[in-house]
Amino acid sequence: MAEDIEEIRKRKLMELQKRYLEQQKAQEEAIKREMELQAQIDAIMRKILTPDARERLGRVKLVKPELARQVELVLVQLYQAGQIREPIDDAKLKKILAQIDARTRREFRIKW
C-alpha cells in the first residue's frame, strides 16, 4: 500500500517535471521567434528610414512601445507591398506617428 502511494507520487512528480520542461521549451522557442522577428523588422527599418527617422522611432519606442510597434508593423506592411519607394525621413515619420496615434488614442471623460 505504501509502495503504491510512493509510486503514484513518483509518477505525478515526473509528469509535473515533464510538463514544466515542455512549457519552458515552448517559452524559449517563443522568445527566439520574437527575437528573430524583431531582427527582421530592424533590418527593414534600416532600409526604409533615414538615420534621423530611426532615431526618432527609437525614442518613441522608449516612451510608447506599443505605438512604435504599430508604426513598425505598418511600415513593414507597406514595404512588403512595394508602396515605399524612397527612404522615409523624419518629417514623414512624424506624420505617420501622428496619424496612428490619433487612431489609437482613447479619450477620457470625467463626468460629475
From Swiss-Prot:
Molecular function, one GO term: DNA binding
Keywords annotated in UniProt: DNA-binding
Superkingdom of origin: Archaea
Record's protein name: DNA-binding protein TGAM_1196
The keyword DNA-binding appears for this protein: yes
UniProt family annotation: Belongs to the PDCD5 family.
GO CC aspect terms: cytosol
Cystine pairings recorded for this chain: none
Alphabetical list of Pfam families matching this protein: dsDNA_bind
